[in-house]
């Protein structure tokens, strides 16, 4: 069993902790709690770089080792880092669990050392017709991020 964690930080008052677990070659389970967000859907992605020297802007594009277009988590054509949306309640918090087979914690495609980012707006899952739909899901600004680190 491989475990990882990302502690989210933000200049906008958003905070949270995201846990990742993977058993062998099974899909990775992602469990998180985030607070300080506006109610509604927020894009949630693994970004390519674990660099926060310039805040969340330094994390690069969505993690996309296969060079595909942006899509929904259940789509065949998607970035590996496309994890869809998290749903934030009226109290500004989100608690969620998801599983995904394209974000392993071990091996050459590992997401350890990369970043997880919560966006200001909903991810249109590549289906919105906006000029950014096929690259970012038109999910808006980066409101919180954290580097995915290995846990003991």
From Swiss-Prot:
Binding site for Cu cation: 45, 47, 62, 119
Primary location class: cytoplasm
Requisite cofactors: Cu cation; Zn(2+)
Disulfide bonds: 56-145
Subcellular location: Cytoplasm
EC category: oxidoreductase
A single GO cellular-component term on record: cytoplasm
Enzyme Commission number, as recorded: 1.15.1.1
Co-factor binding details: Binds 1 copper ion per subunit. Binds 1 zinc ion per subunit.
Induction note: By sulfhydryl-containing molecules such as glutathione, DDT, and cysteine.
Reaction(s) this enzyme catalyzes, per UniProt: 2 superoxide + 2 H(+) = H2O2 + O2
GO MF annotation: an example: copper ion binding
UniProt keyword list: Antioxidant, Copper, Cytoplasm, Disulfide bond, Metal-binding, Oxidoreductase, Zinc
Domain of life: Eukaryota
SUPFAM superfamilies, sorted: Cu,Zn superoxide dismutase-like (SSF49329)
Record PROSITE patterns: SOD_CU_ZN_1, SOD_CU_ZN_2
A family per Pfam: Sod_Cu
Binding site for Zn(2+): 62, 70, 79, 82
Subunit annotation: Homodimer.
Protein family membership: Belongs to the Cu-Zn superoxide dismutase family.
Functional description taken from the UniProt entry: Destroys radicals which are normally produced within the cells and which are toxic to biological systems.
Designated name of the protein: Superoxide dismutase [Cu-Zn]
The organism of origin for this protein: Nicotiana plumbaginifolia
């Amino acid at each position: 069993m491989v475990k990882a964690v990302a502690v989210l930080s933000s200049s906008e008052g958003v905070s949270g902790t995201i846990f990742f677990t993977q058993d062998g070659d099974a899909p990775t389970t992602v469990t998180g709690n985030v607070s300080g967000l506006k109610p509604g859907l927020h894009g949630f992605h693994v970004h390519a770089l674990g660099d926060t020297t310039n805040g969340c802007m330094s994390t690069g594009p969505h993690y996309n080792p296969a060079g595909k277009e942006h899509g929904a988590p259940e789509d065949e054509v998607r970035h590996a880092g496309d994890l869809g949306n998290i749903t934030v309640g009226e109290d500004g918090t989100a608690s969620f669990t998801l599983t995904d087979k394209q974000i392993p914690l071990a091996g050459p495609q590992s997401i350890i050392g990369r970043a997880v980012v919560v966006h200001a707006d909903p991810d249109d899952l590549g289906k919105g017709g906006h000029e950014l739909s096929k690259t970012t899901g038109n999910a808006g600004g980066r409101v919180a991020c954290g580097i995915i680190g290995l846990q003991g």
